[in-house]
Amino acid sequence: MDNLESVYGIPFHGEEHEEPGEEPHGEERIFSTTDSETFNIKGSYNVNGNLINKIDFNYRDSDYTLTEDHEEGDHDEPHDPGEEEHEPTVFLNNAVEYGASFDISNSDLSQNIVVNFVDEDNSIFGEESFMNPANSEEFTVGYYISKDFDLFNVDVGMRLDQIERSGSVTDEEHGDVDYYNVDDSTNSFAASLGRDLSDNLSINIGFASLERLPSVIELFMNGPHMATGRFEIGDPTLGSETSENFDITFNYEKDGFYAYASFYVNDVNNYIALIDQEEHDEEEEEGEEEHHNECHHEEEEEEEGGDPHPHPELICSMYMQEDAEFDGYEFEFGKSFDMDSGVLNLSFGRDVVNAKFSDGHYVPRINPSRNVYAM
């Protein structure tokens, strides 16, 4: 049983442009409080039968709460009774997961069959309830097989997911609610080939074809999210995301010195990304332009006296799909030194990822390159 609570602050938003004669606006900080409760059960039953050797089972029940609240940056000035108060926003995630792994290995092959079920509820309440309550159910069946030959080792894995996501989207202007239900299956496959080139050097080559359905956030998001500074809009018509990944890895170890290097290329069809509209105007197709204009149309109506979009200062961002290619590498090398009172380990590593859409512009929100030093 785990219970974790934390509080952290998100930096002040940047100051907005102020017209001449306007009173300066105080900065605003968003504080987040998380509360996570998890109950886990794991076990194993030794069958020792003709077909099944043992069964590993697991059960997990988790409740996660994230509360975002606002605090004005200027604490010295007295509070203005007419000033707008910000109510907290509460994000709730309740999930139940259970499954089992059946070991059916024999003297020639290592084999496992895995079944798993997840039932997850997501809901948001408060001032920034930018998504209606949504539910996701996933049933997974997987098969893994491994064979060690004299010259190399082969690993193969296959997975079938049956997924159902249900939710709704509320029209910001008219208040109409549209209900959606996504019920589909995905298939994934992965294989790797490994070989020892010498007593100290080994190589592993892998290929994977993966399919992923959009999450409830990507499907049903529709509203302001102050923590990201965006008015985020999902798309219930998003399709599955498929990727093909090729990677090659080298490992070396001798006399306390170790090193590894990995290179990969990943082609993704219908990659799902949150795109800021002001950076995507020229690339949008006709259907996407209509959706984009709808977001800006709300801002225009607010200027005319209405208030369908209460946060026109936020960047309008939409979940979209476009083919993309990822490539990158990572490596690490180091050495261990035996000391009188222990072992000293020194290492250096670096990882780099490049990601571009098919038309050449960069995929947003990709982790920057980093160097890692350790002692």
Model-derived features with residue positions:
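Surface-exposed extracellular loop regions of Gram-negative outer-membrane beta-barrel proteins
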Residues: 19, 162-175, 181, 199-246, ...
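Face-selective signature of the C-terminal outer-membrane beta-barrel domain
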Residues: 33-208, 253, 260-263, 325-336, ...
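Short Gly/Pro-enriched turn/cap motifs at secondary-structure boundaries
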Residues: 31, 237-239, 321
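Extracytoplasmic loops and strand-loop junctions of Gram-negative outer membrane beta-barrel proteins
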Residues: 18-28, 38-39, 70, 74-86, ...
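Gram-negative outer-membrane beta-barrel transporters
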Residues: 264-267, 284-290, 295-375
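Small/polar-residue-rich segments within soluble enzyme cores
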Residues: 249
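Periplasmic-side early beta-strands and strand-to-turn transitions of outer-membrane beta-barrels
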Residues: 1-34, 49, 66, 175
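Glycine/serine-rich loop-strand microenvironments at binding/catalytic pocket rims
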Residues: 1-4, 9-14, 21, 252-280, ...
